[in-house]
Amino acid sequence: MAHKKAGGSTRNGRDSESKRLGVKRFGGQVVIPGNILVRQRGTQFHPGVGVQIGKDHTLFAVVEGQVKFEVKGKLKRRTVSVVAA
């Protein structure tokens, strides 16, 4: 009789789904209120003028205008603003 020994088991084979984080609207792009600008974990980017932050640290536009990325302050914080186009 033909025999085949049992194959060993593996402890691999799992991976989490990617979360699609990152900058969604780049500098100079025109946005309307509600547009998501940045999806992030923690505050890599801080909200500036015309931008608010969601409970998952998502930055979104609250006014219509052009996206502007800046480095501000003594702590060199990266901020995202929406200025009138």
Swiss-Prot record:
- Which keywords, in A-to-Z order, does the entry hold? Ribonucleoprotein, Ribosomal protein
What species is this protein from? Marinomonas sp. (strain MWYL1)
Task: Fetch the Pfam families from UniProt.
Answer: Ribosomal_L27
Q: Does the keyword Cell cycle apply?
A: no
GO terms, molecular function: structural constituent of ribosome
- Taxonomic lineage: Bacteria, Pseudomonadati, Pseudomonadota, Gammaproteobacteria, Oceanospirillales
Q: Which GO terms describe its cellular component?
A: cytosolic large ribosomal subunit
PROSITE patterns given in the database record: RIBOSOMAL_L27
UniProt cross-references to SUPFAM superfamilies, sorted A to Z: Ribosomal L27 protein-like (SSF110324)
Q: What residue spans carry the region label Disordered?
A: 1-22
Q: Protein name, please?
A: Large ribosomal subunit protein bL27
User: What protein family is recorded?
Assistant: Belongs to the bacterial ribosomal protein bL27 family.
Q: Does the keyword Repressor apply?
A: no
Entries under InterPro entries matching the protein? Ribosomal_bL27, Ribosomal_bL27_CS
Tell me, which GO biological process terms does this entry list? translation
